[in-house]
């Protein structure tokens, strides 16, 4: 009955789409997916180019994250590198040009381990596609950026951040000194990005583990310290932060009390941001 009412009353649909808690989900994913015709084509068993295409160019990964579903022994030989780039380029060539956000670069293996990552970024740009990349930033050193300046041409760069101190990050990634290395790389990146006047949208993704809902406030403090250490005229170098729960098969879900606490912490962060603190 409820679904029938919603289908037949546009005002209810407007409330859900424009004012509901899932507004971004509807407007950024569901509605564009429907408008693309992909769902109708699937039902009718007609071919259509995928609505979103993930490019996973990593050859290996230095992390063994506790919530990652990948095979920790997985890696690709360097001999397959050129063939892989050729396949990616063919895929980009075949893609319809009506959606500039069709592609993104990510992976169960770390994208920066591909020494030709710059070629992929440039090829997307050449074909008028936006390029966004997700990385753990362990390799995002000054030297790496010098060798791969194409990183600054990305439309969006999102770093997966795995802990608010060295102990927690090591527990998650199984990589010693990962917290120190990644934090240092982020600080250097924002400085270089500012100097090069790069327009890349930059931010972090953080996984909220069970019983770690207070980490959000500590995470914000870390970002504030990075901003202070960078000492740029631009006070805030971060354009966004995304949060998610541990959705791995054996991940421990947050209970209602922990969700309420996390919600309160998010509101606290909003207040700090509004006060420019």
Each language-model region and where it sits:
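Glycine-centered loop/turn positions within well-structured domains
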Residues: 63, 131, 164-167
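A general structural motif
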Residues: 48-52, 98-102, 126-130, 151-156, ...
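Radical SAM enzyme [4Fe-4S]-AdoMet core and its adjacent flexible, acidic
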Residues: 1-14, 56, 77-78, 83-86, ...
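N-terminal [4Fe-4S]-dependent radical SAM core
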Residues: 2-54
């Amino acid at each position: 009955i409820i679904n029938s009412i919603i289908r037949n009353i546009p005002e209810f649909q407007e409330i859900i789409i424009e004012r509901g808690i899932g507004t971004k989900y509807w407007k950024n994913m569901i509605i564009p997916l429907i408008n693309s015709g992909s769902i109708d084509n699937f039902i009718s068993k007609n071919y259509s180019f995928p609505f979103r295409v993930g490019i996973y160019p990593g050859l290996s990964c230095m992390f063994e994250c506790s919530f990652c579903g990948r095979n920790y022994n997985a890696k690709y030989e360097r001999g397959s590198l050129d063939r892989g780039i050729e396949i990616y380029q063919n895929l980009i060539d075949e893609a319809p040009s009506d959606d500039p956000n069709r592609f993104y670069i990510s992976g169960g293996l770390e994208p920066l381990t591909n020494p030709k990552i710059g070629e992929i970024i440039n090829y997307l740009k050449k074909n008028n596609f936006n390029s966004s990349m997700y990385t753990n930033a362990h390799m995002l050193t000054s030297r790496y950026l010098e060798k791969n300046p194409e990183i600054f041409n990305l439309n969006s760069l999102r770093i997966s951040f795995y802990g608010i101190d060295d102990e927690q990050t090591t527990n998650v990634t199984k990589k010693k000194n990962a917290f120190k290395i990644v934090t240092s790389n982020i600080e250097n990146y924002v400085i270089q990005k500012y100097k090069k006047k790069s327009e890349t949208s930059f931010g972090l993704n953080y996984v909220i583990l069970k019983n770690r809902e207070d980490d959000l406030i500590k995470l914000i403090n870390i970002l504030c310290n990075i901003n202070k250490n960078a000492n740029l005229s631009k006070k805030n170098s971060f354009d966004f932060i995304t949060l998610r729960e541990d959705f791995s098969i054996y991940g421990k879900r947050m209970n209602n009390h922990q969700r309420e606490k996390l919600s309160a912490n998010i509101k606290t962060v909003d207040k700090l941001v509004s006060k420019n603190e």
